[in-house]
Amino acid sequence: MNLNSIPAFDDNYIWVLNDEAGRCLIVDPGDAEPVLNAIAANNWQPEAIFLTHHHHDHVGGVKELVKKFPQIVVYGPQETQDKGTTQVVKDGETAFVLGHEFSVIATPGHTLGHICYFSKPYLFCGDTLFSGGCGRLFEGTPSQMYQSLKKLSALPDDTLVCCAHEYTLSNMKFALSILPHDLSINDYYRKVKELRAKNQITLPVILKNERQINVFLRTEDIDLINVINEETLLQQPEERFAWLRSKKDRF
């Protein structure tokens, strides 16, 4: 299996998995044009689309792709039923695509119906988990997003986290504002800064590394707890997550 990223809009990535025969899976095609160009250039045969949630920058290209390739099966959560989804999937179910079984994981927070797809080592997490950050809470609660991130963080160490946006540099600037002396965060920030200066992608990331540099996955970390305690005493990790998310919203 080959993993490919297709840039779209200002900072989106549309992920494509293809096998040796050229069959491919497309994840969150917000725009059809760059996908159609990649399909033509690589001689791919699209078999399926995965949708993580209903936002337009993730679903906008579905109808055009299905019109061009009517055999495509479109998997998505209930909230994408009017966006072109032909196979609604929910937490605990599986999608069998390209000979691989993908587990569906409910991750409410960014939207209430947001889902992720996992088939070792690939995690397609939409706008739930970003490198160094997490999605804004447009519909869900901090507690829901905390639980969603906890699920994803429990996946195997070698999981390849395929996020839908290039937000890594701004996320790491925020992380540095919270933990300015953290060695892992500083090292990763320098690496990301160099990559982005060359206009290079920072994704996918390995989950084991992400747990070290993503403050939203470190709500039980003593260094982070000490920083938060300087401002307010919060006993529960969900409360610390909410504090972080509120800070990031204003950053």
From Swiss-Prot:
It is an enzyme of class 3 (hydrolase). It catalyses: an S-(2-hydroxyacyl)glutathione + H2O = a 2-hydroxy carboxylate + glutathione + H(+). Binds 2 Zn(2+) ions per subunit. Zn(2+) 2 binds at D57, H58, D127, H165. Pfam families: HAGH_C (PF16123), Lactamase_B (PF00753). Zn(2+) 1 binds at H53, H55, H110, D127. Its EC number is 3.1.2.6. Keywords: Hydrolase, Metal-binding, Zinc. GO terms for molecular function: hydroxyacylglutathione hydrolase activity; metal ion binding. Its cofactor is Zn(2+). GO terms for biological process: methylglyoxal catabolic process to D-lactate via S-lactoyl-glutathione. Pathway: Secondary metabolite metabolism; methylglyoxal degradation; (R)-lactate from methylglyoxal: step 2/2. The keyword Phosphoprotein does not apply. It comes from the Bacteria. Monomer. Belongs to the metallo-beta-lactamase superfamily. Glyoxalase II family. Thiolesterase that catalyzes the hydrolysis of S-D-lactoyl-glutathione to form glutathione and D-lactic acid. This is Hydroxyacylglutathione hydrolase. It comes from Escherichia fergusonii (strain ATCC 35469 / DSM 13698 / CCUG 18766 / IAM 14443 / JCM 21226 / LMG 7866 / NBRC 102419 / NCTC 12128 / CDC 0568-73). The gene is gloB.
